[in-house]
Amino acid sequence: MFDIGATELLVIAIVAILVIGPKDMPLALRTAGRWIGKIRQVSSHFRTGLDAMIREAEIEEMDKKWRERNAEIMAKHPADQMQPLDAPDPALSAAEARAAHTEAAKPARAAEETQADRASADEHPAASEPRLPLEGRD
């Protein structure tokens, strides 16, 4: 930030000792430290405010783009033409809709029953299966 080299810093320290004196130097350095701290605090607050304004502008811009894109999509696909995926076809009667739902659920039930059959078969081998001499007896 400030381009102060070692020689400039040494000159400033010598002048400060001569002007302020060694007795008042700690008080002067404390005061200078407080000023520098306040300057940093104000600078940080200012930078944070600018970052927040930039972030808000970006969010507003993205919101505007999102609204435009949403309007385009809604114009291409009007709401009256769209149906929910899980809703039955309105042309079907209630009985036909129930039957279609039951047919869709059958493969899942069959898979569950098959897994249960396999588990019970693993636990209790059939009597016709030969036993090896090393297998444990029930």
Swiss-Prot record:
Ranges annotated as spanning the membrane: 1-21
Cell membrane found in the keyword field: yes
InterPro entries with a match to the protein in the record: TatA/B/E (IPR003369), TatB (IPR018448)
Record GO biological process: protein transport by the Tat complex
Compartments in which it is found: Cell inner membrane
Covalent S-S links between cysteines: none
GO MF annotation terms: protein transmembrane transporter activity
Gene3D superfamilies: 1.20.5.3310
Ranges annotated as biased composition (Low complexity): 83-97
Function: Part of the twin-arginine translocation (Tat) system that transports large folded proteins containing a characteristic twin-arginine motif in their signal peptide across membranes. Together with TatC, TatB is part of a receptor directly interacting with Tat signal peptides. TatB may form an oligomeric binding site that transiently accommodates folded Tat precursor proteins before their translocation.
Family: Belongs to the TatB family.
Subunit structure: The Tat system comprises two distinct complexes: a TatABC complex, containing multiple copies of TatA, TatB and TatC subunits, and a separate TatA complex, containing only TatA subunits. Substrates initially bind to the TatABC complex, which probably triggers association of the separate TatA complex to form the active translocon.
Protein's name according to its UniProt entry: Sec-independent protein translocase protein TatB
Gene for this chain: tatB
